[in-house]
């Protein structure tokens, strides 16, 4: 048996590990791209236990669903960045033409008929905000009832959409369904904990800039290290 044949299993193992490394790098790159985008009112983070699963929450600031706080997950395909489109599933029931009323899955084929390597996850996240901010009657629906009401009885559609908003708010403080430390959770406002943070945020910019940070051993007006006399 030749030396090359003996070494082949190790080579295959190394190739597999390298592919995993490249895949993890691709996922980290996608998340970095998400972080640098100016995405309004939507927050996502990969699971601490599974980088193919991302947790997200959308705060809707305008439109029919204004005021809603909708949780969702993004699941990347096993062979990402190749393969099909990532899957978005809402954890809150959302009455919407593009959201499956039974599974909560968002019908992404309307905007991403074919997922390519050049597609970015941040654009998918941006699409989530878009469909909750402005409902387009031209969308190819997955929820036929919602689509029909949008066309024939807008008032009733808006009423059911507002019920989705109300339900989402009633679940904001629910305990997490997983022990994953990256799952996004919220707690009620605590005056002792949050008031100092709020005051810091609303502090005038000039005061924050002039605030002393740390210690200095340099005498004002001098560039010589340790020129400042020690004070006790």
Annotate each PLM feature.
Residues 2-12, 137-232:
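Charge-rich (especially acidic), low-complexity segments
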């Amino acid at each position: 048996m030749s030396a090359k044949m003996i070494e082949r299993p190790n080579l295959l193992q190394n190739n597999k590990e390298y592919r995993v490394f490249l895949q993890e790098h691709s996922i980290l790159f996608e998340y970095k791209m998400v972080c640098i985008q100016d995405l309004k009112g939507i927050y996502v983070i990969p699971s601490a236990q599974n980088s193919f699963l991302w947790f997200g929450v959308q705060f809707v600031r305008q439109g029919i669903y204004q005021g809603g706080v909708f949780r969702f997950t993004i699941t990347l395909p096993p062979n990402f960045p190749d393969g099909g489109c990532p899957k978005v599933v809402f954890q809150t029931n959302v009455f919407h033409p593009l959201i499956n009323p039974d599974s909560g899955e968002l019908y992404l084929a309307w905007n991403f008929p074919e997922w390519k390597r050049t597609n970015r996850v941040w654009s998918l996240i941006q699409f989530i905000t878009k469909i909750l901010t402005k409902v387009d009657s031209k969308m190819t629906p997955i929820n036929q009832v919602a689509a029909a009401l949008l066309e024939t009885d807008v008032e009733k559609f808006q009423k059911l959409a507002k019920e989705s908003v109300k339900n989402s708010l009633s679940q904001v403080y629910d305990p997490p369904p997983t022990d994953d430390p990256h799952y996004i959770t919220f707690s009620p406002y605590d005056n002792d904990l949050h008031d100092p943070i709020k005051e810091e945020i609303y502090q005038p910019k000039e005061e924050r800039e002039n605030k002393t940070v740390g210690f200095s051993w340099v005498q004002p007006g001098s560039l010589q290290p340790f020129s400042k006399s020690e004070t006790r």
